Amino acid sequence: CSLVGSEMCIRDSRSAELDCSMRYYNADGSAGEMCGNGARCFALFAEHLGIGGETKFFDATDGVHTAHIRRAQGPAGEIELGMINVSEIRSGDGWWFLNTGVPHYVEMVHDVDGIDVNGRGRGIRYDTGRFPQGTNVNFVEVTGNGAIRMRTYERGVEHETLACGTGATAAAIITNYALQHGTTKYRIQVPG
């Protein structure tokens, strides 16, 4: 991945029951369960190849997903991605842990810019006492009603990443859960 400047690689493997099957590999070569942003790109690529209908059905290591592509004029549009259900949320002193396809630690902070994402993130990511499989680490700042900023240390990439779709999902769930906003849509600002 470093030769082309990417953080991951996705491979399509055909499936008899579904439109396609996605396998995700991190920059360090390890297999990942899911990548939300990668899945959106994968669905758009499948559309480009003429695979499936307007709604794509595909599996990833974490389970079966759907991707519904809605086109606006030209290349613009929206991809609505069906993620796995979150079955459990664990919490500690100012942090939460959940799985949105991959494991995510979420910590609410007052100033996301003041966080040493690589230093703190690495320490939490490798805290096998709390997270035996390791975890992605998200630092989240609420900037308004329905608006948050997020920075993520990504497992497998092993440094801060510019954007993380499963992390954004985790951040929205935890912001709503922890603050009981009742908001179902969030605008999430990430570095990328």
Regions from the language model: what does each represent?
Residues D12-S13, A67-I69, V140:
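A structural signal for short hydrophobic beta-strand segments in well-ordered beta-sheet cores
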Residues A27-N99, T169, I173-G192:
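Acidic, low-complexity central loop/insert segments
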Residues S30-E33, Y153-L162:
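Short pre-catalytic strand/loop immediately N-terminal to key active-site residues, enriched for Gly-Thr
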Residues G36, G101, V140, G165:
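Residue-level signal for inorganic ion chemistry
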Residues H110-V157:
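A mid-sequence, solvent-exposed acidic-amphipathic segment
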